[in-house]
Amino acid sequence: MQVTVKTFAQTREITGEDNIALNLSKNSTIETVISQLKARSDKWALALEGSVLTACNQELCDLQTELSDGDELALFPPVTGG
């Protein structure tokens, strides 16, 4: 199955990528995607270290959410500031 991963803010700036198509095996979870992305390069590992807010098809979800073919996964860095 294929999913589209979208990145925003600091994650996009660090990786230099905004949309990525990933081929995954059936029953893959968001945690699987994050692990695969971290293994891609040091930039991805840095961008996804710590907590990441995730949304699947524009709904907030947790790391154990199973993905389906055609899903859109958005990865947001934690909100910071003061």
Give the predicted meaning of each segment:
Residues M1-T80:
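Ubiquitin-like/PB1-type beta-grasp interaction modules and other compact soluble beta-rich domains
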